[in-house]
């Protein structure tokens, strides 16, 4: 008699995805972040659900409802800070996951990579609308500034902005619809994750060597379930240290002041995980140009498979491209720092250099390095 998990239609799908899945035997800890992202998503949906039970999406009561959650709801403070810091952990895992994809050439699995880019954009949209909900100063002004960017679109821009606002400024209608978006988007993300996994399991995972691993596969369970469990425990430990000891370290103090349309904060800035994109946006003096650069800073990931001319898969045996990769990472960290600084010299100059370098490394330098690497054997 065959085992139930191999026969039952539903269990069979789970079995092929998480139990008997043939997995390369040499994938390193950098491959843990996919499962960690799944865990982050579950934490965010669960904590978000409980927050939504007590939150009111009305301009007059939104701020006080968040205060009420923290003060009066049983473990409300824990749920709220798990949700806020869970988002930060989500983005840390996302950036590492994408970085690993670039380093090891996983972008050559085209469908998986493109769905991944859509997932990244959807998660960023979810985080943005979620940041508006507590209705603090930075929520309000962040929403005003970022939605206002759409007015840079020629001809239809201003109409589009007023349509999204539901009026002539960020107000009650905006908050209500942002809450609706913030509620529905994580479920859309979950559906996209399933498609992401579907495409991944069509081809099988990439591995650190960049070679075909069909000759050396092991079952996912118990080897990688145990390995993922260790990653999950480390992530939970870091998250709980953040939540219990430093809950506000990644937040903005301005968000403890209720939203006031008549008083602009000294420095309007988004959450830390958007600062690199914000720096790119600010580094271009033209409004439309800035918006395009902001969008392209994420969409540039889609050009990686097109620009790849290397004969090798991944950067593991390509020292020149490796050096460029780490310069690119350092450059993004620099831009993250610049995005949080005021708009004055020398920060504006550093921001502009970092922005230009980020695009140049991917579009110009990496393809050149690949060509050099391809021709090195010919030089001997």
Swiss-Prot record:
<dbReference type="InterPro" id="IPR005797">
    <property type="entry name" value="Cyt_b/b6_N"/>
</dbReference>
<keyword id="KW-0496">Mitochondrion</keyword>
<feature type="binding site">
    <location>
        <position position="201"/>
    </location>
    <ligand>
        <name>a ubiquinone</name>
    </ligand>
</feature>
<comment type="subunit">
    <text>The cytochrome bc1 complex contains 11 subunits: 3 respiratory subunits (MT-CYB, CYC1 and UQCRFS1), 2 core proteins (UQCRC1 and UQCRC2) and 6 low-molecular weight proteins (UQCRH/QCR6, UQCRB/QCR7, UQCRQ/QCR8, UQCR10/QCR9, UQCR11/QCR10 and a cleavage product of UQCRFS1). This cytochrome bc1 complex then forms a dimer.</text>
</comment>
<keyword id="KW-0679">Respiratory chain</keyword>
<dbReference type="GO" id="GO:0005743">
    <property type="term" value="C:mitochondrial inner membrane"/>
</dbReference>
<keyword id="KW-0999">Mitochondrion inner membrane</keyword>
<dbReference type="InterPro" id="IPR030689">
    <property type="entry name" value="Cytochrome_b"/>
</dbReference>
<dbReference type="GO" id="GO:0008121">
    <property type="term" value="F:ubiquinol-cytochrome-c reductase activity"/>
</dbReference>
<comment type="function">
    <text>Component of the ubiquinol-cytochrome c reductase complex (complex III or cytochrome b-c1 complex) that is part of the mitochondrial respiratory chain. The b-c1 complex mediates electron transfer from ubiquinol to cytochrome c. Contributes to the generation of a proton gradient across the mitochondrial membrane that is then used for ATP synthesis.</text>
</comment>
<feature type="binding site" description="axial binding residue">
    <location>
        <position position="97"/>
    </location>
    <ligand>
        <name>heme b b566</name>
    </ligand>
</feature>
<dbReference type="InterPro" id="IPR048260">
    <property type="entry name" value="Cytochrome_b_C_euk/bac"/>
</dbReference>
<dbReference type="InterPro" id="IPR027387">
    <property type="entry name" value="Cytb/b6-like_sf"/>
</dbReference>
<comment type="similarity">
    <text>Belongs to the cytochrome b family.</text>
</comment>
<feature type="binding site" description="axial binding residue">
    <location>
        <position position="83"/>
    </location>
    <ligand>
        <name>heme b b562</name>
    </ligand>
</feature>
<dbReference type="GO" id="GO:0006122">
    <property type="term" value="P:mitochondrial electron transport, ubiquinol to cytochrome c"/>
</dbReference>
<feature type="transmembrane region" description="Helical">
    <location>
        <begin position="288"/>
        <end position="308"/>
    </location>
</feature>
<keyword id="KW-1133">Transmembrane helix</keyword>
<keyword id="KW-0479">Metal-binding</keyword>
<feature type="transmembrane region" description="Helical">
    <location>
        <begin position="33"/>
        <end position="53"/>
    </location>
</feature>
<protein>
    <recommendedName>
        <fullName>Cytochrome b</fullName>
    </recommendedName>
</protein>
<keyword id="KW-0249">Electron transport</keyword>
<feature type="binding site" description="axial binding residue">
    <location>
        <position position="196"/>
    </location>
    <ligand>
        <name>heme b b566</name>
    </ligand>
</feature>
<dbReference type="InterPro" id="IPR016174">
    <property type="entry name" value="Di-haem_cyt_TM"/>
</dbReference>
<feature type="transmembrane region" description="Helical">
    <location>
        <begin position="347"/>
        <end position="367"/>
    </location>
</feature>
<feature type="transmembrane region" description="Helical">
    <location>
        <begin position="178"/>
        <end position="198"/>
    </location>
</feature>
<keyword id="KW-0830">Ubiquinone</keyword>
<feature type="transmembrane region" description="Helical">
    <location>
        <begin position="226"/>
        <end position="246"/>
    </location>
</feature>
<dbReference type="InterPro" id="IPR048259">
    <property type="entry name" value="Cytochrome_b_N_euk/bac"/>
</dbReference>
<dbReference type="Pfam" id="PF00033">
    <property type="entry name" value="Cytochrome_B"/>
</dbReference>
<dbReference type="InterPro" id="IPR036150">
    <property type="entry name" value="Cyt_b/b6_C_sf"/>
</dbReference>
<feature type="transmembrane region" description="Helical">
    <location>
        <begin position="77"/>
        <end position="98"/>
    </location>
</feature>
<keyword id="KW-0349">Heme</keyword>
<feature type="binding site" description="axial binding residue">
    <location>
        <position position="182"/>
    </location>
    <ligand>
        <name>heme b b562</name>
    </ligand>
</feature>
<keyword id="KW-0408">Iron</keyword>
<dbReference type="InterPro" id="IPR005798">
    <property type="entry name" value="Cyt_b/b6_C"/>
</dbReference>
<dbReference type="Pfam" id="PF00032">
    <property type="entry name" value="Cytochrom_B_C"/>
</dbReference>
<dbReference type="GO" id="GO:0046872">
    <property type="term" value="F:metal ion binding"/>
</dbReference>
<keyword id="KW-0813">Transport</keyword>
<dbReference type="GO" id="GO:0045275">
    <property type="term" value="C:respiratory chain complex III"/>
</dbReference>
<keyword id="KW-0812">Transmembrane</keyword>
<feature type="transmembrane region" description="Helical">
    <location>
        <begin position="113"/>
        <end position="133"/>
    </location>
</feature>
